[in-house]
Amino acid sequence: MVVSLFSSRNVFYTLSLCLFAALYQPVMSRPAKFEDDFRIAWSDTHITQIDGGRAIQLKLDPSSGCGFASKKQYLFGRVSMKIKLIPGDSAGTVTAFYMNSDTDSVRDELDFEFLGNRSGQPYTVQTNVFAHGKGDREQRVNLWFDPSRDFHEYAISWNHLRIVFYVDNVPIRVYKNNEARKVPYPRFQPMGVYSTLWEADDWATRGGIEKINWSRAPFYAYYKDFDIEGCPVPGPADCPANSKNWWEGSAYHQLSPVEARSYRWVRVNHMVYDYCTDKSRFPVPPPECSAGI
């Protein structure tokens, strides 16, 4: 069944979100050229720099996908990119933007995974949080716009108290520090910033029912406005614990009232999967699921 991206009940609120996103500007924004902070990590023949390195193109074809990574790792801060996703029939493809500690079995990881679709269906973004090697915390949201028509900003804000995933400055997920409930929280290992474009038609679209259509290849995704603000590791030893870092300020301890309303709107109208409510996987909800925002 084709799902409409918009419904009459959502139009007014969608316009309100657009106004909020236009008025809000990230603190100390510093968009950079690709080579300032990143390197090609996988298949350099499939990544092309555009506009003097201010934007890049990722390509997926039957021979290979591709990926890039930050030159440094970071412990706390905010990372963001503007991404224009694959248009049309993108079923079976995954465009990922994530942070990863690169520590194998005890890895920490914060994921945005954009799951390709058949033409006319909404794009789904899956988020996941790995802490001390434990993941299985998937949530899925249908985006309320067509992310292939223009660039949209995707950001991860990470401090000692919480992790927030943003789409155009609208929070779509909050993961709190619940170590008091014996829930692991990523606060010891620095993480690099990564992005990949790859084929995953065994699970990405409708659980693997929709397969990739290679006759439409190559598939392209575009990136620009790369922004990393955080404590580099190696770097000043006192940086990660410095409470004066802007991302540790009181404004970033909890969502603002406007953000909280936007977050609830996303969950009510656009969330299509939440591990917290999946009783087949978790008959007893994990303890972090009752933490609220």
From Swiss-Prot:
Cystine pairs: 231-239, 276-289
Q: What terms describe the molecular function in GO for this protein?
A: hydrolase activity, hydrolyzing O-glycosyl compounds; polysaccharide binding; xyloglucan:xyloglucosyl transferase activity
Report the family membership. Belongs to the glycosyl hydrolase 16 family. XTH group 1 subfamily.
What domain of life? Eukaryota
Q: Report the coiled-coil segments.
A: none
Q: Which UniProt keywords apply?
A: Apoplast, Cell wall, Cell wall biogenesis/degradation, Disulfide bond, Glycoprotein, Glycosidase, Hydrolase, Secreted, Signal, Transferase
The name on file for this protein is: Probable xyloglucan endotransglucosylase/hydrolase protein 7
> Gene encoding this polypeptide?
XTH7
What residues does the record give for site: Important for catalytic activity? 111
Q: What does this protein do?
A: Catalyzes xyloglucan endohydrolysis (XEH) and/or endotransglycosylation (XET). Cleaves and religates xyloglucan polymers, an essential constituent of the primary cell wall, and thereby participates in cell wall construction of growing tissues.
Residues linked to a glycan: 117, 213
Q: How does it get modified after it is made? A: Contains at least one intrachain disulfide bond essential for its enzymatic activity.
Give start and end of each GH16 domain. 30-223
Which N-terminal stretch is annotated as signal sequence?
A: 1-29
Provenance organism = Arabidopsis thaliana
Which E.C. number(s) belong to this protein? 2.4.1.207
EC main class here is: transferase
Active site (catalytic residues): 109 (nucleophile), 113 (proton donor)
Q: Residues that bind xyloglucan, according to the entry?
A: 113, 126-128, 136-138, 202-203, 207, 281
Kindly state which reaction or reactions the protein catalyses. Answer: breaks a beta-(1->4) bond in the backbone of a xyloglucan and transfers the xyloglucanyl segment on to O-4 of the non-reducing terminal glucose residue of an acceptor, which can be a xyloglucan or an oligosaccharide of xyloglucan
> What is a single cellular component term in the Gene Ontology annotation?
apoplast
